[in-house]
Amino acid sequence: GGPGGAGPAGTTGSQGAGGNGGSGGTGGDPGDGGNGANGSVFTNNGIGGNGGNGGNAGPSGAGGSGGAGSTFGATGSSSSIHVNGGNGGNGGNGDHALSGNGAAGGNGGNGGNGSLRGSGGAGGHGGNGGNASRGMGGDGGTGGAGGNAGQIGNGGAGGNGGDGGTGSDGNPGAITGSGGRGGDGGVGGQGGSVAGDGADGGRGGAGGTGGTGLRGTTGATGATGTFDAGADGHGGNGGTGGVGGTGGAGGGGGNGGAGGKALSPTGNNGSQGAGGDGGAGGAGGTGGTGGDGGRGAHGTLFSSLAGTGGTGGNGGTGGTGGAGGAGGTGSTLGATGATGAAGRAGNGGVGGSGGLGSAFGPGGTGGMGGAGGTSTVSAGGDGGRGGFGGDGLDASSGGNGGDGGHGGDGFRTAGAGG
């Protein structure tokens, strides 16, 4: 199929959306979605077209791949003040294969950037991989990145990754296929340079289930939340890791984005984004590790508060909790380490370190270690180590160290304390 055409320009209203890509013919690849039209003065931007779906598989061939979402949602024109970026198109789904491997899902398009006071557009989601009757499942498409804001505005959210396709069972005369890989989540867009929040990272796609006798694939890692560049803005949260296919490990959670630094002497700094949770493991698979919390922004002169460290993501079932983020300079507290997930031995995350004291201000208290996960099968998880207290500056005192996390209960043996 041919690519979709760009949307027509609006006269008094919003710009048109990009056309969708045509679906592929039998055994053929589809067209990509067209780009959204750019916004003119005082108009909003068009949304990027969606990618076409893959064509049906031929008698012995694999299905066509999903088309990519439009490369960019439209960007606000330089003469426009309040124009938001267009959203990226979604990737098409890969076709299921009767004989051969499932086709890959298309990638999501990136969100467009905002104009002077516009927010960024959201990234498109990745398409799902096709399932296989006699072969491997297709990979999920990658989520598109969120668009960045102008001077004032929020960043666009990152798109989610597509899920991997299911592999075939080893039936007589058939090939046992592995599951497709989950697509990565898209990165969140940056907040405005003066004010605005950074956006959340996209969720990682789930790993595909493997055919009988094969392990499923590992879930994809959640994307990192983007930092905010403006005053009082908060960092985006990390995307959640994808769930593992049967027998496959869960994907790791994305890290939290950095908190924004206040530009005025009296404004407060933004807090860190939290780390994404680790994906749960498939049956027999290990849970993914939680993402670490980001570091809190430092305080400015004349006592604006430092941002608190982001919370570590929880471990997926059986996975380790992510570490808490460190507090910014002048911060009161480091973040608490995340609790380890229940499982065979989920360990608690490490507490974040307390921030350094500002002039004549005491150091921050270290975050508490996460609790170990409780197990019904074997030993409980260990508690996480407490964070270090922050050092005092000038004539100020240092911060206290964080408490260790409690050990998880075991079926027969209790876990050790932090």
Task: Give the role of each language-model region.
Residues 1-418:
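Collagen triple-helix signature
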